[in-house]
Regions:
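Amphipathic alpha-helical interface surfaces
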Residues: 28, 32, 49, 73-74, ...
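Terminal, regulation- and interaction-focused segments at domain boundaries
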Residues: 2-39
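Well-ordered alpha/beta subsegment
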Residues: 114-138
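Beta-strand/loop substructures that line and gate deep hydrophobic ligand-binding cavities in soluble
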Residues: 91-119
Length: 138
């Protein structure tokens, strides 16, 4: 436990931001979808990894991925640095750990900036994922 009862996640710093959610995986993802749509972004896919695992006869903790974006924001990034296409569209992973804590995880825009040498003036095109995800777990 962290400060003031905050749940801590003990994972290496690998460019992924993890936010604890007070809701279930399904509820958190539904809230995230609603916020993404309200911001005018396009939802491209919702992948239910745990559901697909169950269809294959395997069991895993609830885990779902939301893929979303806006070509007007992403295309200038890909023109400036084509390798960022491997990390776009934006992705947010909502998952439950072995202690039944729910997490919303996403790539740190600053990490993506360094990884793909994104020009400073284009970082704003992906920086909005932070506030969107924070709102989803609030």
């Amino acid at each position: 436990m962290g400060a003031q009862g905050e749940v801590m996640l003990n994972l290496p710093d690998n460019g992924i931001i993890h936010l604890n959610s007070p809701r279930s995986v399904s509820e958190t993802l539904a809230r995230l979808e609603s916020i993404v749509q309200a911001k005018g972004l396009t939802i491209l896919a919702r992948i239910d990894h745990s559901g697909d695992a169950a269809k294959a006869g395997l069991k895993m903790q609830p885990t779902q991925l939301l893929i979303f974006g806006n070509p007007k924001s992403g295309t200038p990034l890909m023109i400036a640095s084509p390798s960022i296409a491997i990390d776009l569209p934006l992705k947010a992973l909502v998952w439950q750990d072995e202690n039944e804590n729910v997490w919303l995880s996403y790539n740190n825009p600053g990490y993506l900036k360094e990884r793909h040498a994104i020009p400073d003036n284009l970082l704003q095109n992906i920086a909005g994922i932070g506030p969107i995800c924070a709102e989803a777990v609030s």
